[in-house]
Amino acid sequence: MMKLIQNIDVYAPQHLGKKDVLIINDKIVKIKDAGSICADGFLSEAEMINGEGLLLTPGFIDCHVHVLGGGGEGGFANRTPEATMEGLTKFGVTTVVGCLGTDGIGRDMCALVAKTKGLNEQGMSAYCYTGSYQIPVHTLTDSIVKDIMMIQEIIGTGEIAISDHRSSQPTFEEFARVVADTRLGGVLSGKAGIVNVHLGDSPRCLDLIERVVDETEIPASQILPTHINRNEMLFGKSIEYALKGGAVDFTGNEDIDYWETICDEVRVCNGIKRMLDAGVNPDRMTISSDGQGSLPMYSSDGEFLGMGVGQSSCLLKEVKECVFKTEIHLEIAISTITSNPADILRLKGKGKVEEGYDADLCILDQELQLVEVIAKGNTVYTK
């Protein structure tokens, strides 16, 4: 199986200019200046893709998705549906990291690992965290270390909740032990050993995370706090944390105006711009969707309007806002959903348009609308 993409403007995510890109099976095998790879000889059998006027980026990585479905906090009727490969790839997502949230009982680690394996077999790339909001962590085996070390799909622990009324109200010692065990599992397996941390509305914000970094030998690189744009106070603390080298994850939204005006969230594009202006390393920022999570919707008067469901479609929507609204360079904006999560989570072969990397690619037009999505060398979406 071969594909030859010709004369396409490549953002790898750094801007490479117009290139020819050769894909054989599931790998990118050659990237040359436009017009340098000729479709003759054995390449005459390759599928030809005309990239004139189009952009090529890495496939998107959604690093926080409730692939088994989320919700349930308002009762069983509020459980949300599972993610599907088609529902992810049509939005450009070629790699997903699944997690459990508030409900670690009605949904468990056996089901999460099985779902993750299924997505991999269907043709995309999928990983997952062990655990849920709760501490002690509900693992698949008898320990966090063993889960990460022995289960291929498990790359860390999460989403552990802190500063939230739905958390287990862990002590510093309990939280630090989870981070330490997760790091050890990563060290022994060659994985990231990341703890994905859900941040709630409490004014305690990132206190437990900061104490782990300040009072133990564990580096900030072992923790990825998410929902940092939940409110202004939390976001301000997150800037301080990121300036110390910590990675931070913005939660994207499909209805961006609603969450900014009604719920007082920090708009993702504005938040990224503020972090860049403050001097935060752009490599330390990611955007995820909280996909399939339940989203209660209220009017400006506080009237309940209904329950929405998080969608991975918000990733590209937020990138467009960064580029067209706050004039952030595309290289920086697109890295938040490609190379940054790949590097932070140590996802080998992911997140870059580079020779030897996996053929996970998105083709977009000049308005950043998806035209085609390629996962593991196969076309999984066309406009």
Where would I find each of the regions flagged by the language model?
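Metal-associated gating/positioning segment near the N- to mid-region
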Residues: 43-46, 51-114
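His/Asp/Glu-enriched, well-ordered alpha-helical/loop segment
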Residues: 277-357, 361-364
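Active-site core of metal-dependent hydrolases
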Residues: 181-296, 304-305
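Divalent metal-dependent hydrolysis catalytic cores, especially in the metallo-beta-lactamase
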Residues: 83-136, 151-165, 187-202, 221-226
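C-terminal cap of metal-dependent C-N hydrolases
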Residues: 8-10, 28, 353-383
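Histidine-rich, glycine-flanked metal-binding segment
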Residues: 2, 10-57
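Active-site gating loops and adjacent loop-to-helix segments of metal-dependent hydrolytic enzymes
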Residues: 71, 75-78, 82-98, 147-168, ...
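Divalent metal-coordination and catalytic microenvironments
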Residues: 8, 21, 26, 53, ...
